Amino acid sequence: MLNFKEKILITLPSLLISLIPLFLITGPFLSDLSVVLVCIFFLINIFLNKEYSFFNNKFFLIFLIFFLYLFINSLIKFYDFNNLRSSIGYLRFGIFSIAVIYFIEKQQKLLKWTFFVFVISFLLLVIDGYIQYFIKENIFGNPVDIRSLRIRLLFNDQYILGSYLSRLFPVFLALTFLLYGNKKNYIIFISFLFVLIETLIFLSGERVAFFFNTLSAIFIIILINKFKKIRFITLLLSFFTIFLISIYDDTAKKRIWDQTINQIGLDSSKMNIFSEIHESHYLSAYKMFLDNKVIGIGIRNFRNYCHEERYKTHADSCTTHPHNTYVQLLAETGLIGFLFGVTLFLYFIFKMLNHLKGALFKKQYLFNDFQICLLSAIFITIWPLAPSGNFFNNWISIVYFFPVGFFLWSLKN
């Protein structure tokens, strides 16, 4: 039985970690507050119990080097307090990842709590998402704007439902296989939820989210061992459901396929990278890089420099960030920061090829199915050939780092 002190220092932060998938639906405030509180509770526990060995972690060491570079970069390229604050605050994501390891070890129920929070969160979003798509209002009866051909996230005004589902679905999949992999009837039942989620990602009208979900599904099907057939069948059922819905209503099809073909320029003589506007962001970022090759213009500074005439490439080329992680790192952190990202991606590919080689020729798997699902979430985060959100945005950073802690825990155990 945990005493009152342990309930506060262990159970409370464990609950906060498990509630993050639900908090992310509401926006950045509650999820970011939870991350900060988890970090504080973690540090209190570490210093009270003198468990400093948790910092003796290769991931944290590499993260710390990257963080120190960001901090020094923001001092050298100081524009206003915003970029300095962002670099200092970035440390919390590395600490949070280590904290997840700590609290899972101290409170094993954290895994089940997180799973059930995922079930509740996804059920809420599935119900609301399909109501928005077919009835044109949310679950509260408020009308939605159907002209955008996209679906909003519940409790949120942003069109990021597909992004949320596609990035966190692999984590939900991982926990399902870990906790209930031996319960065949349960896996079959939960597979229907998988199909509903994947279909909704398509209906959300978010092209990148649909691409990422398909990419992670292929990644998982190729690399997992025990649940390969289940994942393949659910993907086929999802595509079949999407096909049937598209016959009835081609709203999502227009957004996913027709608009993409038009923006890339496949129906004209001029080809674009993703779209004409995306291409203008990349060209502006590249010009900034050419003027600041080694350390870039400073984190979160794209928005401050893009309005300058020398960097304008299009009427809409100025925005908050260049909409691609690697392009943003190149422009804002220079070659040094960019090499961090590229090295991580190449190392990741190397490990996955080793896993595939062992699976094909030796029937030995470097990673288990739980880890592969988590790695698929990380894979779509570091995938270079797709538009992405602001790398230093709080909400997206939480989504990026959330699976990392669970993966690190699995390596340790």
Regions found by a protein language model. Give the residues of each.
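Alpha-helical transmembrane segments of multi-pass inner-membrane proteins
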Residues: 20, 71, 95, 112-142, ...
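Selective detector of the "anchor" transmembrane alpha-helix that sits immediately C-terminal
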Residues: 332-354
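Juxtamembrane membrane-water interface segments that cap and precede transmembrane helices
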Residues: 17, 142-154, 315-327
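Interfacial transmembrane-helix termini
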Residues: 21-38, 53-56, 69-93, 104-113, ...
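Transmembrane alpha-helices of multi-pass inner-membrane enzymes
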Residues: 37-43, 217-218, 344, 374-413
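A membrane-periplasm/extracellular boundary helix in multi-pass inner-membrane enzymes
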Residues: 127, 204, 224-269, 283-291, ...
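Long extracytoplasmic/lumenal interhelical loops at the membrane interface
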Residues: 268-291, 295-333
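Transmembrane signal-anchor hairpin modules in multi-pass inner-membrane enzymes, especially those
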Residues: 1-82, 102-112, 116, 175-188, ...
